[in-house]
Amino acid sequence: MAVKIIVGLGNPGPKYQWTRHNAGFMVLDRLSHLAGIAISKKTFSGVCGEGNWQGERLILLKPQTFMNLSGRSAAEAIRFHKLPIEDLIVIHDDLDIPFGRVKLKQGGGHAGHNGLRSLAQELGSGDFVRVRVGIGRPVHGDVVNYVLNNFSPEEMASLPRLLDGVVDLVEMLAREGLPKTMSLYNNKDLI
């Protein structure tokens, strides 16, 4: 049975719960609910849950270090479990993808995303799988305020469909691997 560490990026605390920057946390919470894997154990500078789902062993991790230091948490988990970086799946928000769309990528730069920057620094490589959840760019105004603000009411209405779609993608990714999942889901509108 393969083991995958799935890290959702976000900021801890109720203040950030519904912000665009917490898309990774939201997906992980939905996956946790559907898979019956409680994310409650305080470890690896985060909260973690482990269990079997759809024939795969999953370790679900939500760093509690705030976005800019997320890499420390993921690196602790990878080292403890002695897993290669190829078994790491990171779910994060992406400004360059319209809301409701998702893209997959193996490796690459951080594109200004501080959580990805921290991961690459702490792991010594950016060669992990990324599930990029589109949040779109602000039409006007500051990007920082945009990502740290809650989704709009219209977006909130579509969020359950988006989260369920990303969970389906993650399930396929853990079971079938990146190439097959990319061919089905890359740049797909999930809402």
From Swiss-Prot:
The record marks N11 as: Discriminates between blocked and unblocked aminoacyl-tRNA. CDD domains: PTH (cd00462). TRNA binds at Y16, F66, N68, N114. Its main location: cytoplasm. It catalyses: an N-acyl-L-alpha-aminoacyl-tRNA + H2O = an N-acyl-L-amino acid + a tRNA + H(+). Hydrolyzes ribosome-free peptidyl-tRNAs (with 1 or more amino acids incorporated), which drop off the ribosome during protein synthesis, or as a result of ribosome stalling. Catalyzes the release of premature peptidyl moieties from peptidyl-tRNA molecules trapped in stalled 50S ribosomal subunits, and thus maintains levels of free tRNAs and 50S ribosomes. NCBIfam families: pth. This is Peptidyl-tRNA hydrolase. It comes from Geotalea daltonii (strain DSM 22248 / JCM 15807 / FRC-32) (Geobacter daltonii). The lineage of its organism: Bacteria, Pseudomonadati, Thermodesulfobacteriota, Desulfuromonadia, Geobacterales.
